[in-house]
Each structure stands twice: as structure tokens, then as C-alpha cells.
């Protein structure tokens, strides 16, 4: 009898442990799946709108610079570097989800021409791998290999991101031609201000949802505030919830207006986008250009030699 009870107790404990582990896995997976750049991938078929605006700007409201460097021209079936720079002050700290301060992260989206894609590992040189570090790039969609995303990654280590790109070969891909192509890039540093569902993060300013008097301010145990605004004319009360992170700007008894900032804006990051151009160069055209330059140089040499020969003939005739 005692053995049966012990076995039953062990079985319950194992079942409970499995349930707890399963819940932790689900919560962790959900947290990861909602991280940048999954937000854009889940909500938009294409990260670049018809207006040219990259959709990351919908969540990262502050405008910051970003720079991209690519070769002026590349040959078919060649691996080259696309270097994206996301500059910011390394001394800055951002508000984390729990309201505490921490280092900024960065992320980027690179929109390449059709046919261009991430270079396979066996085509990447050791020098390029060293520049890439431990970054793991992914396609925006399985069917959109020309659109690459990365992030969030530590900004102090990866404010300069090197993408290894493989150029297409028009001989193998009939829809690719030897032309000049545009490349678009978007880069952010720090957390966003708006979530995809339209709700605010704690990395933005909070405004009053009503006009009136600040009748009560309650500081929550885990951080953040609960602000009660009383409309003296109607006697109506509105409660605004402020999450941990932003600093409070108002005090009890203060008269405020509708949409007046209740907090500071803690955001120190932002998003920027840029573009560049790259030429997919025809090797035959390059060979033709080299042949032409060689012909010009040879012609110049022959002209110089002919001129010297003519001068010698003239000199000999004058002496005669």
C-alpha cells in the first residue's frame, strides 16, 4: 500500500514538472517569436512600402542616420560585402522592458535586387567571416531570399554589420540582367515605441488622456505610476497607467491639459533608412574595355616611336 502511494506521488511530481517546463518553453518561444525582426515579418509581406518607406519606422518613431557601403560594380556569381553602419553614442543607456536601464541593441533589414542573396558559408572567405563575427542572418521570407534581416544584436559590438552577398549569374537566371540596381537598407538602434498591435511600449512619452487636476499619484510596487485625473467641471475621473521606465513630469494638484505629457521621453534610439546603387557588370564588357585601353596605349606608343623616327629622318636630311 505504501509503495503504491509513493509511486503515485512520484508520478504526480513528474507530471507537474513536465507541465511547468512546457509552460516555460511556450512563454519563452512566444517571447522570442515576438522579437524584432519578427514583428515586421509577421505583419508585412514586404518591408518596403510603395512610398519607399521601410515599415520598421512604424514602431521606431525617432529618425536617426544609417549608412551603407557596397562596391560600385560586381561580376556575376561573386561574393561581396555590404557594410551597414548604425552609429550612436555608445555611452547611452536605453529603458528595458522591466524599466531598468541597459545597453542598446541594433537591427537591420537589407533589401537587395532580385537574384542577389546571402552567400553560402562555403563561399565566404576567412577575412569576411572575421568581419561578420557571430551574426546569424535570415531571409525575410523563404521566397524572398533577396531581403535579409538581422537583430536584435548588441549595439556596442555590432554597430557595423557586414552582410556577405552573392551576386546572381544572368547565364543561369534568365530574369537577371547586366544593369545598375538599387539597394535599400533600414537600421535601428534601441527599442521601439509602438508595438505592432498599436499599443505603446515603455520606451516612449505618455500623455494625459483627459484635462483636469491631478488628484492622485500612486507609485506601483514594481515600478510605474497610476495617475488619477479629475475633471472639475464634470466630476469625472480618469486613470492613466504609466509603465516602469519613463520619468514622471507632473505632481498632485497640478492642472493639466488634454494630451499634455505626463512623462519624459526615455527613447534614446531611432530608425533610419538609406540606399545605394550597384552595377552587375558583364565580364565581356570588362574584357572589351581592357582591350580598348590596351589598344589606346599601344597606339600612343607607336605614335611616339613614329614621331621619333620622323625626327631622326628630318635631322639626317638637314645634316646632309
Swiss-Prot record:
It is found in: Plastid, Chloroplast thylakoid membrane. It comes from the Eukaryota. Binds 1 heme group covalently. One of its GO terms (molecular function) is heme binding. Heme binds at residues 36, 56, 59-60. Coiled coil: none annotated. InterPro entries: Cyt-f_TM (IPR024058), Cyt_f (IPR002325), Cyt_f_lg_dom (IPR024094), Cyt_f_lg_dom_sf (IPR036826), Rudment_hybrid_motif (IPR011054). Its cofactor is heme. The chain crosses the membrane at residues 286-306. GO terms for cellular component: chloroplast thylakoid membrane. It is a single-pass membrane protein. Residues 1-35 form the signal peptide. Keywords: Chloroplast, Electron transport, Heme, Iron, Membrane, Metal-binding, Photosynthesis, Plastid, Signal, Thylakoid, Transmembrane, Transmembrane helix, Transport. PROSITE patterns: CYTF. The keyword Cytoplasm does not apply. One of its GO terms (biological process) is photosynthesis. Component of the cytochrome b6-f complex, which mediates electron transfer between photosystem II (PSII) and photosystem I (PSI), cyclic electron flow around PSI, and state transitions. The 4 large subunits of the cytochrome b6-f complex are cytochrome b6, subunit IV (17 kDa polypeptide, petD), cytochrome f and the Rieske protein, while the 4 small subunits are PetG, PetL, PetM and PetN. The complex functions as a dimer. Belongs to the cytochrome f family. HAMAP family: Cytb6_f_cytF (MF_00610). This is Cytochrome f. The gene is petA.
Amino acid at each position: 500500500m505504501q509503495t503504491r502511494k509513493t509511486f503515485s506521488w512520484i508520478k504526480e511530481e513528474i507530471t507537474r514538472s513536465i507541465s511547468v517546463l512546457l509552460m516555460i518553453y511556450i512563454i519563452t518561444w512566444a517571447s522570442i517569436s515576438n522579437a524584432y525582426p519578427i514583428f515586421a515579418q509577421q505583419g508585412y509581406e514586404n518591408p518596403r512600402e510603395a512610398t519607399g518607406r521601410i515599415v520598421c519606422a512604424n514602431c521606431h518613431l525617432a529618425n536617426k542616420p544609417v549608412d551603407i557601403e557596397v562596391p560600385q560594380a560586381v561580376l556575376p556569381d561573386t561574393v561581396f560585402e555590404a557594410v551597414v553602419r548604425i552609429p550612436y553614442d555608445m555611452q547611452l543607456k536605453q529603458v528595458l522592458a522591466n524599466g531598468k536601464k541597459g545597453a542598446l541593441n541594433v537591427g537591420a533589414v537589407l533589401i537587395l535586387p532580385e537574384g542577389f542573396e546571402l552567400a553560402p558559408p562555403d563561399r565566404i572567405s576567412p577575412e569576411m567571416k572575421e568581419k561578420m563575427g557571430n551574426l546569424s542572418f535570415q531571409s525575410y521570407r523563404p521566397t524572398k531570399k533577396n531581403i535579409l534581416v538581422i537583430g536584435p544584436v548588441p549595439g556596442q559590438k555590432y554597430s557595423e554589420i557586414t552582410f556577405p552577398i552573392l551576386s546572381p549569374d544572368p547565364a543561369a537566371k534568365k530574369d537577371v540582367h547586366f544593369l545598375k540596381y538599387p539597394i535599400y537598407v533600414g537600421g535601428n538602434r534601441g527599442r521601439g515605441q509602438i508595438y505592432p498591435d498599436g499599443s505603446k511600449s515603455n520606451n516612449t512619452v505618455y500623455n494625459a488622456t483627459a484635462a483636469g487636476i491631478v488628484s492622485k499619484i500612486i507609485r506601483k510596487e514594481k515600478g510605474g505610476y497610476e495617475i488619477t485625473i479629475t475633471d472639475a467641471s464634470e466630476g469625472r475621473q480618469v486613470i492613466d497607467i504609466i509603465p516602469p521606465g519613463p520619468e514622471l513630469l507632473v505632481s498632485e494638484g497640478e492642472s493639466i491639459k488634454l494630451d499634455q505629457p505626463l512623462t519624459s521621453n526615455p527613447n534614446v534610439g531611432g530608425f533610419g533608412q538609406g540606399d545605394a546603387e550597384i552595377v552587375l557588370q558583364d565580364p565581356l564588357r570588362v574584357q572589351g574595355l581592357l582591350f580598348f585601353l590596351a589598344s589606346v596605349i599601344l597606339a600612343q606608343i607607336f605614335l611616339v616611336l613614329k614621331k621619333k623616327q620622323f625626327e631622326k629622318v628630318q635631322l639626317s636630311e638637314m645634316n646632309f
